[in-house]
């Protein structure tokens, strides 16, 4: 807090980066975060070894599936869940500009993961969507009567992209994939737009989240966090909205097994997509049961949150 408020009490601006286990941040030092925000602190909180399944060998004590939700409650906190290095760089640049160019008293909370993955080139014009909270990373490969939209965040985005490819090749489903860098920022603008529309009935505006997801295409959202995080934008999603999350206790196992257990892996995304289409009458009855059997997914398992 002293470093984050030095611009005020010492007229010596600093750019503090405080890196910690994401599980131990908002959960164990939340009072300090609130006090820092109330003191008009500026800086970056870096939630390292983030995610319920990414830190895969340390069980309940270290596996964070909820700090993004806790961060969303702090008015001055911007919470981010980047998937690629270019997203992280864009977010850091944006935060610096907000705090030191625009003199905004805000804290940026950024998820950092410890999983290696392929780094893809940044799409042209992606900066705007990254800062808004979501942007499209993969177009539908072909036109199809059946369409699905998949939202992914952090390391789970790679599974969303794999699922989209398999949906097209094996089921003829046209799929687009979005990287959601911040459900909190999408929600923040959505609430601002609702207030504007409530107070200005003749001057209605549409929030960015509605422009992205307000049509009737079924949407699947998946992340390494509990379902309540993607559910923050549910009211602005036009079509059916299915959320896959890591509700429950952390467990010690391989990432592959954990992601199958919490049903956020490629196969689980495919099943959720086919289910949305089958329920909407766009897939033959029995598609989900047949595909689940082929993939070895147990339809009658116990609730993973218990």
Regions from the PLM with identified roles:
Residues 34-52:
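A glycine-rich helix N-cap at a beta->alpha junction
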Residues 1-12, 35-40, 72-74, 234-236:
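Alpha-helix C-terminal capping segments
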Residues 40-44, 76-77, 217:
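Short glycine-/polar-rich loops that comprise or flank the Walker A/P-loop
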Residues 10-23, 44-47, 152:
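A short, small-residue-rich loop immediately preceding and capping a beta-strand
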Residues 15-20, 26-32, 36, 67, ...:
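Extended, hydrophobic alpha-helical segments in both membrane/secreted and soluble proteins
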Residues 53-66, 72, 79, 87-91, ...:
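Thiamine diphosphate
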Residues 18-26, 48-50, 56, 60-61, ...:
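Active-site nucleophile and cofactor-binding loops and adjacent substrate-binding regions
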Residues 1-5, 29-33, 162-166:
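Histidine-anchored nucleotide/phosphate-binding helix
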């Amino acid at each position: 807090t002293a470093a984050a408020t030095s611009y005020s009490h010492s007229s010596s601006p600093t750019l503090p980066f405080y890196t910690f286990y994401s599980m131990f941040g908002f959960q164990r030092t939340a009072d300090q975060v609130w006090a820092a925000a109330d003191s008009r602190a500026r800086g970056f909180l870096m939630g390292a070894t983030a995610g319920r399944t990414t830190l895969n060998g340390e069980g309940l004590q270290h596996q964070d599936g909820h700090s993004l939700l806790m961060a969303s409650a702090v008015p001055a906190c911007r919470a981010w869940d980047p998937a690629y290095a270019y997203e992280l760089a864009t977010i850091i640049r944006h935060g610096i500009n907000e705090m030191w160019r625009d003199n905004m008293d805000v804290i940026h909370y950024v998820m950092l993961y410890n999983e290696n993955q392929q780094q893809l080139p940044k799409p042209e014009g992606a900066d705007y969507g990254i800062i808004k909270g979501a942007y499209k990373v993969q177009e539908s490969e072909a036109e199809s009567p059946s369409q699905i939209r998949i939202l992914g965040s952090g390391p789970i985005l790679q599974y969303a992209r794999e699922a989209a490819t398999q949906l097209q090749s094996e089921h003829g489903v046209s799929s687009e994939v979005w990287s959601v860098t911040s459900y909190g920022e999408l929600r923040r603008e959505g609430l601002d737009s609702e207030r504007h529309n409530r107070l200005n009935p003749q001057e209605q505006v549409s929030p960015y989240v509605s422009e992205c997801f307000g049509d009737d295409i079924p949407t699947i959202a998946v992340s390494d966090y509990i379902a309540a995080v993607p559910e923050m934008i549910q009211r602005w999603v036009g079509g059916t909205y299915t959320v896959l999350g890591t509700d429950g206790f952390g467990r010690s196992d391989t990432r592959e097994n954990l992601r199958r257990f919490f049903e956020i892996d490629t196969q689980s995304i495919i099943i959720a997509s086919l289910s949305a289409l089958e329920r909407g009458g766009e897939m033959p009855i029995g598609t989900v049961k047949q595909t689940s059997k082929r993939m070895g997914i147990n339809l009658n398992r116990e609730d993973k949150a218990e």
